[in-house]
A protein has these predicted regions:
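Helix-loop-beta segment of a Rossmann-like dinucleotide-binding subdomain
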Residues: 155-169, 206-242
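Helical element adjacent to the flavin cofactor pocket in flavoenzyme catalytic cores
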Residues: 218-272
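N-terminal glycine-rich phosphate/pyrophosphate-binding loop and immediately adjacent elements
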Residues: 2-143
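Mid-domain catalytic core of redox enzymes
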Residues: 259-376, 511
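Rossmann-like flavin
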Residues: 96-209
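C-terminal segments that line or cap access tunnels to active or ligand-binding sites in enzymes
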Residues: 334-434
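A glycine-rich dinucleotide-binding beta-alpha-beta segment and adjacent secondary-structure elements
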Residues: 188-203, 356-363, 419-477
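A conserved FAD-binding loop/helix module that cradles the flavin
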Residues: 55, 473-495
Length: 511
């Protein structure tokens, strides 16, 4: 089979890049090590329960046009769509001193804050007014039009000059942190804690480590488009991308573990699979993390040999700091007398501890409140997770006991929402950093790079090795579903002529 491109990994970044290239007419093969596509966004089933393995919070996936969500833009390009369920409030934050409802409607959100701290609500409004003009400027430049090389400049100047001019007053915060804006506008400690928490939920870092455009986009999109859950769970998103890939002639191969990226005469020329198969293509795109692509782990060799990259580049890349891994609970519970249950919750156990402390901040998703088909009749499906360091975890005789112990903060968090949850259990699955690393093939099971705003930038899709490109959460623009979809768009568009992208935009009516 003659191929134009091989994509390693079927996370959302990899599937997006592959499907876009197929849409452009390339012959593309995606090699996925796992038996299920989707990477951190895959769904899995146990005893009639359908679980999201990772993300469950989405906005801008529905029918509103135009959508600013890069993932929705890709689905439009592919001719695919999703059935979604809108909801509000979008969640509840449970602090030691009380529970706070979080609304996507900006006015209701500020009203809820004002009931706790009237002055803080005014400061929050000033904070949002500093960020939302950045969103208004960015919204006029669809991600689907962008690329990651010098040819972006004539595209921006030729098609989006008015939008660029709108950004000029905000240049100071585009590469700045949310913390910089917060320090200027917000003194109230409760609101500062709220902003830190929302940044942490987005990026894995607090306000001073999170770039301002990321939060501007979040604030704008959840207000404009609202929040939605895809019917069928996160796996429905993966299925739509796979359908789009195949619709345009691409191929997905499961249980196809890539052992090595092949390099000849200083160029990436293909891959070798664990079963010995050799596949050749002039373009290789790695959806593996920066550490797994360049450095490997104690149990997995890197995709590239040391000598395939400049030493200084490789060493610098492997010094990229990583966010911790996770403890997970995937539970099936009886649903009687839970009629008023809502779907998203965040529990902070100790206000005097840092919210990034493992076990202190726990995220909870109960998606069967929106899609009853995810659980057997009369039951709910529950996913809870919290940060957990990889260090010290090993599959020894103490492993099962340690799993039980380290999952207790998650159970205590769930008891804030469903006090008798332990008595409702019909299925209990505990995931550890080792689970995260094994199933997702991720270095130390990490959430992604801990690249703080103002300290460094996420690298682009290009690498020093001709023919090799990267997508996913260790490339620009970073962590999160919209971001990794954007990384796939940027990579795919960079590999075709600008005219091809322009024709795509004309066909979509986005020009």
């Amino acid at each position: 089979m003659s191929l134009d491109a091989i994509v390693i990994g079927s996370g959302i970044g990899g599937l997006t890049a592959a499907a876009m290239l197929a849409r452009y007419g390339m012959r593309v093969l995606v090699c996925e090590s796992h038996a299920i596509a989707g990477g951190a966004a895959h769904s899995f089933q146990r005893r009639g329960f359908t679980f999201d393995s990772g993300p469950s919070f989405y906005c801008g996936l529905g029918k509103q046009r135009p959508s600013l969500n890069p993932l929705r833009q890709v689905l439009d390009v592919l001719g695919e769509s999703l059935q979604v369920v809108p909801y509000d409030p979008m969640g509840h934050y449970h602090f030691p001193d009380g529970t706070f409802p979080v609304y996507s409607n900006a006015e209701r959100y500020r009203e809820a804050v004002a009931r706790i701290t009237p002055e803080g609500a005014k400061e929050l409004e000033r904070f949002e007014k500093r960020l939302l003009p950045l969103y208004e400027a960015l919204r006029d430049v669809p991600t689907i039009a962008l690329r990651a090389d010098w040819q972006l400049i004539p595209v921006l100047v030729g098609r989006y000059l008015p939008s660029l001019l709108k950004m000029l007053p905000h240049l100071g915060i585009i590469q700045g942190s949310v913390g910089d804006v917060m320090d200027k506008e917000v003194r109230d400690p409760w609101v500062r804690r709220l902003i830190d928490l929302e940044c942490f939920l987005l990026s894995g870092l607090k306000a001073h480590g999170t770039i301002a455009p990321e939060v501007a986009f979040m604030l704008g999109e959840r207000t404009r488009a609202g929040v939605e859950y895809p019917v069928g769970g996160s796996g429905a998103i993966v299925d739509a991308l796979v359908r789009g890939l195949k619709r345009w002639g691409g191929e997905l191969r499961l249980n196809a573990h890539v052992e090595q990226i092949l390099v000849e005469a200083g160029k990436a020329v293909g891959v070798r699979l664990r079963n010995g198969d050799v596949l050749k293509a002039p373009i290789v795109i790695s959806n593996a993390t920066i550490w797994d692509t360049y450095g490997g782990t104690h149990s997995r060799a890197p995709l590239l040999r040391k000598e395939d990259l400049p030493q200084s580049y490789r060493e610098s890349a492997l010094k990229t700091p990583a966010v911790d891994s996770f403890m997970h609970l995937h539970l099936g519970i009886r649903a009687e007398r839970l009629e008023g249950l809502t779907g998203h919750h965040v529990v902070v156990h100790n206000a005097s501890q840092d919210i990034t402390e493992p076990g202190n901040t726990c995220m909870i998703s109960i998606p069967s409140v929106w899609d009853a088909n995810l659980a057997p009749e009369g039951h709910h499906v529950v996913h809870a997770y919290t940060l957990e360091p990889f260090e010290g975890w090993q599959r020894d005789e103490a492993y099962e006991q340690r799993k039980k112990e380290r999952s207790q903060p998650l159970f205590r968090a769930l008891e804030r929402v469903i006090p008798d949850i332990r008595q409702r259990l019909v299925l209990e699955l505990i995931g550890t950093p080792l689970s995260h690393s094994y199933y997702l093939r991720r270095y130390q099971g990490t959430y992604g790079p801990a690249i703080a705003a103002g300290k460094a930038m996420f690298p682009g899709c290009q690498t020093p090795l001709p023919g090799l490109y990267r997508v996913g959460d260790s490339t620009m623009p970073g962590i999160g579903v919209p971001a990794v979809a954007a990384s796939g768009i940027l990579c795919a568009n960079t590999l075709v002529m600008p005219q091809q992208t322009s024709e795509l935009l004309v066909n979509l009516g986005k020009n």
